[in-house]
């Protein structure tokens, strides 16, 4: 039986990937709630969907199997045969703890599986449920929050709720409350969808963990090494716990490299500033290093008495040592001009999706970064991005690779 999950590198030929087509959750963003929903602007959904469809077709043209999160979730929910248990979990994690939770549950239970999944993703407005007698003071206030269930507009960034490492997966505790429920869909799919439930899929780290971990910070360097960013969204303690889990249960993993990056929104995950594009080539945002090209990296290995942690500053040399090559090439996002570099990094110039060794998908808007990649011998497929980029994520962010060929 073929493995349902297999990721042993960032660059092996991509075979199967999970995406989420932008939907009506994006139309529930309003200016007042932009910040809490983690957006800087309101996208135009119709164009966003066209751009996403173009992106998906680009992958399909490369013989990549593209699976949709919303479709798998509905199929898994039908297979589970217990909508109420799943719905209760969703509502409980939405902080609907008063009587309104009962109204929400009863309303959503009237939907079939596809409709329920769509509604849970899109969010549930208070105006959608028939008017009832108001019993509580908070319901009588003139200033009313418009949602019973918040929309999940970041769901099209399927990279973050989970990440495949080897034949197992991390189902992540998301840092921001606006994204916490996203990984419930992944949990549902892995547990109940026939594509995955018939196999014993190891869970390296679960969403009940006490510390946040997000897939944009998880990079599988090779069969023996994982890189994890310590960032705005991923806690150092989560990295340590993940390393302990991998060393105990994934015998092929020998090292975890923890890379410390600035805790800012523009650098929210490691893959916004660093991605692998070929066997010894990487894109990098120059601003995460000092003038000597250094940044903090910590090598975590299994020792006789627990974890052994070795601090280093020479990041490029560490990568070369792990890959067992004389040196690696760092291709600067936006080049050496600090203005161009900052602009293109903001628009995800470093967030490449490798679909094969030396072959990537990027946003078309980052012309300097794309030209530099081509000069370095990388085959670049550009996709349109005027609306997709408003969510602060690029091609890597919009995909959760499930299967890659081994190198």
Swiss-Prot record:
Is Transferase there in the keyword field?
no
Primary localization: cytoplasm
Signal peptide span per the entry? none
EC number(s) from the headed UniProt entry: 3.5.3.6
Q: Where in the cell is it found?
A: Cytoplasm
Family listed: Belongs to the arginine deiminase family.
Q: What is this protein called?
A: Arginine deiminase
Lineage start? Bacteria, Bacillati, Bacillota, Bacilli, Bacillales
């Amino acid at each position: 039986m073929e493995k349902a999950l297999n990721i042993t590198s960032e660059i092996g030929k991509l075979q199967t990937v999970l995406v989420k087509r932008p939907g009506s959750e994006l139309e529930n963003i309003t200016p007042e709630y932009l910040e809490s929903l983690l957006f800087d602007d309101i996208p135009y959904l119709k164009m966003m969907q066209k751009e996403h469809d173009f992106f998906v077709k680009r992958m399909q043209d490369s013989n990549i199997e593209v699976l949709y999160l919303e479709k798998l979730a509905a199929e898994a929910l039908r297979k589970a045969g217990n909508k109420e248990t799943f719905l209760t979990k969703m509502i409980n994690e939405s902080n609907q703890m008063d009587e309104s939770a009962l109204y929400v549950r009863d309303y959503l239970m009237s939907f079939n599986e596809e409709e329920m999944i769509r509604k849970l993703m899109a969010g549930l407005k208070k105006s959608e449920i028939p008017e009832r007698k108001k019993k509580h003071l908070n319901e009588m206030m003139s200033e009313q929050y418009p949602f019973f269930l918040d929309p999940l507009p970041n769901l099209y960034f399927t990279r973050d709720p989970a990440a495949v490492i080897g034949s197992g997966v991390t189902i992540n505790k998301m840092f921001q409350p606006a994204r916490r429920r996203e990984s419930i869909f992944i949990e549902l799919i892995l547990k109940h969808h026939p594509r995955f439930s018939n196999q014993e899929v190891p869970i390296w780290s679960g969403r009940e963990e006490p510390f946040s971990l997000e897939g944009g910070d998880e990079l599988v360097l090779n069969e023996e090494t994982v890189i994890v960013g310590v960032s705005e969204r991923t806690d150092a303690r989560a990295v340590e716990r993940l390393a302990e889990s991998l060393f105990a249960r994934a015998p092929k993993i020998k090292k975890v490299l923890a890379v410390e990056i600035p805790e800012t929104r523009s650098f929210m995950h490691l893959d916004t500033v660093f991605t692998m594009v070929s066997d010894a080539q990487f894109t990098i945002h120059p601003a995460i290093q000092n003038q000597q090209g250094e940044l903090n990296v910590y090598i975590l290995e299994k020792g006789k008495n627990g974890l052994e942690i070795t601090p280093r500053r020479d990041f490029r040399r560490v990568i070369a040592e792990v890959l067992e090559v004389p040196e690696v090439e760092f291709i600067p996002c936006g080049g050496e001009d600090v203005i161009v570099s900052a602009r293109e990094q903001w628009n995800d110039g470093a967030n490449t999706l490798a679909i094969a060794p030396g072959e990537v998908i990027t946003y078309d808007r980052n012309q300097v970064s794309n030209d530099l990649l081509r000069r370095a011998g990388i085959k670049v497929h550009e996709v349109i991005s005027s609306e997709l980029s408003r969510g602060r994520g690029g091609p890597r962010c919009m995909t959760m690779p499930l299967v890659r060929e081994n190198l």
